[in-house]
Swiss-Prot record:
Keywords: Glycoprotein, Repeat, Signal, Sporulation. It is found in: Spore wall. One of its GO terms (biological process) is sporulation resulting in formation of a cellular spore. Glycans are attached at N103, N306, N418. The gene is cotD. This is Prespore protein Dp87. Residues 148-170, 175-197, 209-231, 240-262, 276-298, 304-327, 332-354, 362-384 form the Follistatin-like domain. InterPro entries: Dict_spore_N (IPR007643), Fol_N (IPR003645), Spore_Coat_Assembly (IPR053121). Residues 454-555 are annotated as: Disordered. Residues 27-144 form the DSCP-N domain.
Amino acid sequence: MRILYLASLLFLITLYLSPTFGWGGGRDCESHRSEYTCKSDRSCAYLPFVSCCGKKEFFCVNRDHRNCCDDLSCAKNTRTGEIFEIWSSCKPHRDFVPYHSPNTTTCESLGCEARGMECEWVESSPCYGTSCCPRIPRCVGHHGGGHKCDRMRCPEGFYCEEQGGSACCVPHHDGCGNIQCPWGHYCVNEHGKCRCVPHRPPPRPPVDQCRNQHCPHGYSCRVIKGCATCVRDARPPHNLCRGFGCPEGSHCEVLEKHPVCVRNHVPPHPPPPPQICGSVNCGPGYICTIINGHPTCIRGDGYLCNQTRCPHDYQCETISTNIVKCSPKNDECKWHRCPPGSSCFNSRNGPHCLANNVFPQLCKVTQCPTDFSCKMIRGNPTCIKARPPVPPPHCSTCAELSSACNHVGMICIQVPSNCTNTRFPCCPSHPICIHPSTTAASTIATTASTVATTTSATTAGTTTGGTTTGGSTSDSSAASSADSSAASSSPSSSAASSAASSEPSSSAASSSAPSSASSSAPSSASSSAPSSSASSSAASSAASSESSESSSATS
């Protein structure tokens, strides 16, 4: 009796565990030929699995004691040769054997660089749609072609090296034999010098395109020709659709008792992932932000505050790129309203209103950034960026003064103006006449820096004077200043000026050239670039021949 009891118990245990162990032992759920009969059997599960080429197929498998939990593995159909990705612990057994991915090697283990070759990721055969069929590495020659040293056999103590596009044998103590390049680089010898150059990065492994795709009810995602496509779940076709052919990219459906071809649903491709600022290293005072999908370095809010020094118990706040405000740390005046002409002041007795004319001038203890000026606004010292001076409606150029300069043997140049008072219009530069010199570049630079302030003040006096005599005097003083600067830098000019000072002045020259120069040279200046016409040999000869006339005009 006891033996019969033990035999019955062993038989029950075998029936319970038979779906889990063995390949086809126990109850064979794979004998079911339809989805209905499989789902009607409680010991069976109807599960879909995907092949490497994107084919989705349903299998009736035995349930196990783990309720078919996730257990990723690979299996190969011995009848068709297809490789399926099995995502469940309930696996098909009939005509299936376990399959191990061939991707057991890496680029590091192949050691392609040591052989002067590159590592390249190639597709598995026949497809690489799942994790069971990933890309595998292999060694290839440079740029995907054969290596020229593959067929070269060097004698002992030598090795093959590609130099100038040709394979040659070099001794081990020379060339790239002892060069150890970092990972991702290989050694090349160019003109007798060795250097490490980077390899092409391997292509990224394939991504499961169906992972983030959502198909309508009754459809499942499949990768067809590299595109994620929603295909109707596998089920017996309708009787009317049997033998009804549809073109590629569509399938048969029965609508109002008639078979029709319906286009397969293709979900829209998601937008590419945005570039992030994690790998961007901006300089100090700059932050990274995404502009038009690209990481861009812009000035951070703290850049201006780093250059601002606020009063005690005040903190800096960047309002815009042109305004920086210093506000109290304990801003109790935030909700305190004051009448016009007064501002809130937070003292020891609390916030109260003070007239603006008696309000503490905190700008005296506030340091603003460069090109910013402090102004009290609503009781807070505020740094405001100074606006550039407004140019006048017309600025003179050398095109207007060159004829007058040439008449007295001089050339015209543009010099910067002294626009310190931004409340009035000011031209950034203005034309003046100087003596030509063989060292024109240094003379122009020296003259421009010397007469910038003097000329701007002189032209202002000419404008206010409004007479021909005043304009003539100002032009003469500008010319004298230019002569003295040119004389200090040019020996020939010094000799010319000393010779001119010993001769008597000519009233005829004094009454013609300077007056015409003053009438054609307005006080304002031009923002155009300085004249490109430098001194020439003709101008130099004219200057030496008319030195007495220019000296008379100057006096």
